[in-house]
Regions:
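Hydrophobic/aromatic beta-strand patches that form the interior of the parallel beta-sheet core
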Residues: 4, 31-33, 92-94, 149-153, ...
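P-loop/Walker-type NTP enzyme "switch/lid" segment
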Residues: 7, 35-119
Length: 204
């Protein structure tokens, strides 16, 4: 498995927490990419408690790629280590955007970045992408088409499931655009609906 893409239809709790928890417990070396177009630097300010100076992150990579830099080397050099309990694995973070609007500047850089992620996967390093909420702008097609797994993160409350229902066409479009597996990641199942009930309702 190489690229694991996580997104949310909106109103779902814990997308970034889910991505971080997955990275910290992942069985292989892994890079967590913050690709949320509405930046919050939650991991840097929360999990890392602001101990590491800000990095240019994704927008810095876009600039470097346009200047002809090697995608894999540049991506790796831009990551920072994430503390974790298992000393025999590498867990690293690629910081996201510095402010609103920067996501629109990535353009063709996503193709180079997705290729770099595939190359890392072949070298034994998986990539987990926190893509933020589904919104007016579609997720980068280069990521969607090359993802091994796309997880749609949702809660099990009625309001959260309503958000999932409203984004059904976008989820279906992603399913058609990838050869990877697309599935639901339910945060807090059984509150009140369990995973089976949610899956049954979402596939109608």
């Amino acid at each position: 498995m190489s690229i694991i893409l996580l997104t949310s239809p909106g109103g779902a709790p814990g997308l970034t927490t889910t991505a971080l928890g997955l990275a910290l417990t992942w069985p292989r070396d892994v890079v967590l990419v913050d690709a949320d177009p509405c930046p919050g630097h939650v991991i840097e300010s929360g999990y890392l408690t602001g101990r590491i100076p800000p990095r240019p992150g994704l927008i810095g990579l876009a600039t470097a790629f346009r200047d002809g830099a090697d995608p894999v080397q540049t991506m790796w050099e831009e990551t920072i280590p994430l503390p974790h309990d298992s000393g025999d694995r590498m867990v690293r973070l690629l910081s996201g955007y510095g402010h609103l609007g920067q996501a629109s500047l990535m353009g063709a850089a996503w193709s180079s970045l997705a290729s770099a992620m595939i190359d890392l996967g072949q070298a034994g390093v998986d990539v987990i992408v926190d893509a933020g909420r589904l919104g007016p702008e579609a997720l980068p097609s280069s990521l969607v088409s090359r993802a091994s797994l796309i997880g749609i993160v949702t809660g099990s409350r009625l309001r959260q499931l309503a958000g999932l229902s409203m984004r059904a066409e976008e989820v279906e479009a992603m399913s058609s655009a990838t050869t990877g597996t697309v599935g639901l990641v339910v945060v807090g199942p059984g509150r009140p609906y369990n995973s089976r009930e949610i899956d049954r309702k979402s596939t109608r």
